[in-house]
Amino acid sequence: MSKELAAMGPGASGDGVRTETAPHIALDSRVGLHAYDISVVVIYFVFVIAVGIWSSIRASRGTIGGYFLAGRSMSWWPIGASLMSSNVGSGLFIGLAGTGAAGGLAVGGFEWNATWLLLALGWVFVPVYIAAGVVTMPQYLKKRFGGQRIQVYMSVLSLILYIFTKISTDIFSGALFIQMALGWNLYLSTGILLVVTAVYTIAGGLMAVIYTDALQTVIMVGGALVLMFLGFQDVGWYPGLEQRYRQAIPNVTVPNTTCHLPRPDAFHILRDPVSGDIPWPGLIFGLTVLATWCWCTDQVIVQRSLSAKSLSHAKGGSVLGGYLKILPMFFIVMPGMISRALFPDEVGCVDPDVCQRICGARVGCSNIAYPKLVMALMPVGLRGLMIAVIMAALMSSLTSIFNSSSTLFTIDVWQRFRRKSTEQELMVVGRVFVVFLVVISILWIPIIQSSNSGQLFDYIQAVTSYLAPPITALFLLAIFCKRVTEPGAFWGLVFGLGVGLLRMILEFSYPAPACGEVDRRPAVLKDFHYLYFAILLCGLTAIVIVIVSLCTTPIPEEQLTRLTWWTRNCPLSELEKEAHESTPEISERPAGECPAGGGAAENSSLGQEQPEAPSRSWGKLLWSWFCGLSGTPEQALSPAEKAALEQKLTSIEEEPLWRHVCNINAVLLLAINIFLWGYFA
């Protein structure tokens, strides 16, 4: 969606720019910042740290299941809140509001599309993942196809995407807001956020991440709704927004161009399939390809659903997340449009010199739409609340990325080199990798600082658009087509990556022209929208996967037990044999997964008493607790206990009452979603 920031946003060319001196309208956001605002921010940090400590103490942190999947004991409401906050980072507040300011409502369709895919996650994908007994998505592909090359490929690709797109986006956007609002040093503010974020991520694992995400979701939604009402009140509610947005033209413009004019279709989601900036077939079908990767196969999102205590709780989390994803259109996109309506000379600037003075970017200043609205409209105290909202968005998305990246590295990469690694070794490695990510994040700050904001968002969206469709095609075929084989899956991925990289190289070689410039890009770029390309790439990858699979030996039926949609309910006995043979990291490790609400301590306390541990210093005890290291040796489970544990962890049975409750809520959610699409179409 943020790709449209550059395409739709006000740009400027050096040719033909009027030379009269524009009024100095630099955004002095720090005016009026009060001690009460700082107090609110401090209180926010205290609450987050308190919740992080509470959940870290409560969590089972000494096992793979406890640290990476919260002991598979999470309820539906924190899962739903975490699904929301993991996706709505500070980058979404800045980028979504900025794109709304530049182009109107259409970008909100990206959020409403997520509702459908969240339900697909809970009803289609998660049942297969739980039945397969996996912790990571590459691990599922290894179980499904065998071999290691697909697992390693997916793990490395995901880590690269997390480090160089998601982390950079959130840090850039959060730092932009904090600098404008507080005037803090960039390194100091970002460093404090990263350290606080990393501490409770390392100490508490996924349970700490999910509970703090739930707190931050409440803060985000509450604060954003307050700003939304203040903004609508200022412009005269929705009719006033329609009138004032269409008149939001800056005083200094580029002659003989229309870049400074608001789009005539700004208040419509579904736009012309040929000339629209976000064509409706691409928004409905092409976006679904990208959203399937994001919501149904991406480790950051799926890991939250896998932590559910039952399939019904996973479904309930998807429903709650779907309801929450309806809101960003109203409390992010529309406030971005309100900001342009109120401040057309700043948010809607097109003169590159004026834009440079306002926000430091010559391509336009739509990125400042949300922070500008906060600093202009929010009263003392509430302004601090909104600063806390952006911090919450930044920290919640970073914790999600940190924990999921740690999971991928530990399970899919480290164990390739250390096959005999112990449970405690994996716990330490997972925590050390989070520290590594924090260091990389801090080193990435100067690169973000020197990057043009529009180009950065353009780059991130391009990377996602050209790498995600092959992954979507692979997972869909892996789950629904039993005939797909490992060679077909691998060579399909390689083909899709090659085609995607080719398009990406062309995109960067021929950047979109600024306002007033002649478009010299080849037709395949300027006339073939990236959402259309996503549909084509997904289809071509699927064709290659199927053709190569049909030319190779099919996978025996018995090896697909509980690994596809059609075999997810097969008896557990076959799964246990296969699990013991192919995934020793889960089934052969006694404390590898702990029952819902339980942990290593409970397992070790069963049976005979443990010998008294030798006394240790407070420093060593604190370090052992921080790293999740048990002071007493784990007691091995008997074969019968292992089988019972495996059955519980891979069960997709549901109580009829709660299954019906989830189904009814899903239908209601879809009805609301369809109504909104129709109303704003």
Curated annotation (Swiss-Prot):
Tissue expression remark: Expressed in the small intestine, kidney and liver.
Function according to Swiss-Prot or TrEMBL: Electrogenic Na(+)-coupled sugar symporter that may play a primary role in D-mannose and possibly D-fructose and D-glucose transport at the plasma membrane. Transporter activity is driven by a transmembrane Na(+) electrochemical gradient set by the Na(+)/K(+) pump. Exclusively recognizes sugar substrates having a pyranose ring with an axial hydroxyl group on carbon 2.
Alphabetical list of InterPro entries matching this protein: Na/Glc_symporter_sf (IPR038377), Na/solute_symporter (IPR001734), Na/solute_symporter_CS (IPR018212)
Name under which the protein is recorded: Sodium/glucose cotransporter 4
Predominant cellular place of this UniProt entry's protein: membrane
Homology family: Belongs to the sodium:solute symporter (SSF) (TC 2.A.21) family.
Entry's Gene Ontology cellular component terms: extracellular exosome; plasma membrane
GO MF, one annotated term: low-affinity D-glucose:sodium symporter activity
Lineage: Eukaryota, Metazoa, Chordata, Craniata, Vertebrata
Membrane-spanning intervals of the chain: 37-57, 76-98, 115-135, 158-178, 191-211, 218-238, 276-296, 318-338, 384-406, 428-448, 460-480, 488-508, 531-551, 661-681
Annotated spans, Disordered: 579-614
Cytoplasmic side: 58-75, 136-157, 212-217, 297-317, 407-427, 481-487, 552-660
Catalytic activity: D-mannose(out) + n Na(+)(out) = D-mannose(in) + n Na(+)(in)
Membrane topology: Multi-pass membrane protein
Glycan-linked positions: 251
